[in-house]
Amino acid sequence: MIETQFLTDLLDQLDLALDQLILNDRNHDRFAIILIDNVAELAFHARIVSIADIELDRKTIVISSDSQKQLRRALGRGFDQKVRFGVTKGWISQEQCDAMIGLHGFRNSSYHQGLRHEEILHSLAIAYFRLVSEFLVSYNFGSYVTSSSDRVSYRALKYLGTPSYSYSIEHFTAAFRRLEEISVILGDTLIRDLASDMSSTIESSDSSISFISCSDDTPERRDWSVVFAQTFVFTQDEDAEEKAVDLGYNKAEGKRLFDWLLEDYRWQVSRDPIPGWRNRLNSLRAEVSPWRALKKYCDFMEQTNDIRLTLYE
C-alpha cells in the first residue's frame, strides 16, 4: 500500500532535481543525478514491497519458489535486482532497464569515486530525469492511503494544486506527466554527447598507440605497439614471473619473460583495436534510441577499460 505522503515526497525531490538541471552546472548536475537516482530506487522498492505484502504473506496465493527468490532478491539492497524485477513485471522495457542500470552506475562513480563525466553529465542527468518521470507516469499505484498528518511541500503543490487530503491517483499521474513534459523541453543531446565523449576516448588511445610506435603508423607496427604496451605493464608487477606460469611461460626454456610475452604469448588484444572501436562509434552515432545508445556507450567503456588504461600507462 502506497502512502500519498510518499508520492508527494517523490514529487518534491524531482522538482528539486529540476532546479539543479536548469542551472546547467556540473556540480548541480551531479546533485541532480543523486536525487533522481534516489527517486528511482525508492519508487521501485515501494512497489516491490506492495507486491511482497500480497505474494509472500498471504498463504492463499500460490507463488513458485523461483518467483519467491526473485522477489526476495528485489527486496534487498541491490538496485539492479529491483530494476530487473520491474522488467519481469512489465513495468519497464529491457531497454529502459539497461539504461537505468547504466545511469545508476554513473551516479555511483560520480558520488563514490569522484569521477566527473563532465562532457556528458548534463545530458545524462536530463535523460535520467526523463526516464524516471516516464516510469512514474505509468506507475501502478494500486491501493494508497492518506493521513491528516500528511505534509505537502510547496514544491509538490506546484504540480498538485490546492492543498487537499483527498488527492487522487489522477492528480499524481498528471503531476509526473508534467515533469515528463518538462524533461522534453530541457532537450535531448544524449546521443550526440555520448558519441563526442566516446570519440575523444578513442582518439586518446589512438594517440597513445602512435606514441608507442614512434609515429610509424603501419598496421604491423601498431599491432606490435599494442602487444608491447601490455607486455611492458605486465612485467612491471613484482610477481610477473609467477603469474606468467599460469599463462604457459616456462623459464627453463631459456627465454626472457619480456621476450616470451612479446613474441609468443597470445594477448586478448593482439591487434590495433582502433578501427573496430571507430566502427562501434559509428554504430552509436546511428542510433535513434537514446537508451540503446547509452547501452552501447557503457558496454564500450567497460569492455575497453583495461586496454585503454594499459595504453595510457
Labelled PLM ranges:
Residues 29-50, 129:
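Short, hydrophobic, well-ordered secondary-structure elements
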Residues 49-113:
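A broadly used, surface-exposed interaction patch
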Residues 11-30:
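A long, hydrophobic alpha-helical segment
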Residues 133-313:
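Polyanionic, low-complexity intrinsically disordered segments
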Residues 1-9:
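Acidic, low-complexity proline/glycine-rich segments
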Residues 9, 13-16, 35, 42, ...:
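Amphipathic, well-ordered alpha-helical segments in soluble domains
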Residues 5-6, 27, 89-146:
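Charge-enriched, short contiguous segments at helix-coil
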